[in-house]
Amino acid sequence: DPFSIINVEIKSPKSGEKDIVRKTIACVKAHHLFDRLIISSFDPRLLVEAKEIDPNTRTGFLYSPDSPVIEQVYDDPIAYAKQIHADALHPLIAYVDEDYLDDCHKSGIIVNPWTVNLEEAMRLCSEWGSDGIITDTPDVAVSVIR
């Protein structure tokens, strides 16, 4: 689908791994898919690095109760997204409701909750205006959205 977004999650690199963000961006650009890319990570440093490599890189911050920076994010997710220059927040679905989505959208922040596998949660995300979802069951998502 030429309109699909490609969400590439980058994990925190193991010691000795270098330039994973730079290599990812270069690979996506080489395949002429950069305009469809969003890089997501639980590690905000990798998202900042992506913006330093190319300020046009779209980034999404993944977070859950286990996130090392959860206190900062939980208190004010929009302020945290702006602090790290993230284009999107990718929260655990339990954090998302209609007010959360409205507040993010008013601030220009995209929201793609995860892991949205239940049909009812997919319907709610759609009704509330979620920009997208991260799911393990894309076939179910397609049938629910149609």
Give, region by region, the residue ranges found by the protein language model:
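Short loop-to-alpha-helix "cap/lid" segments that border enzyme active sites
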Residues: D1-R146
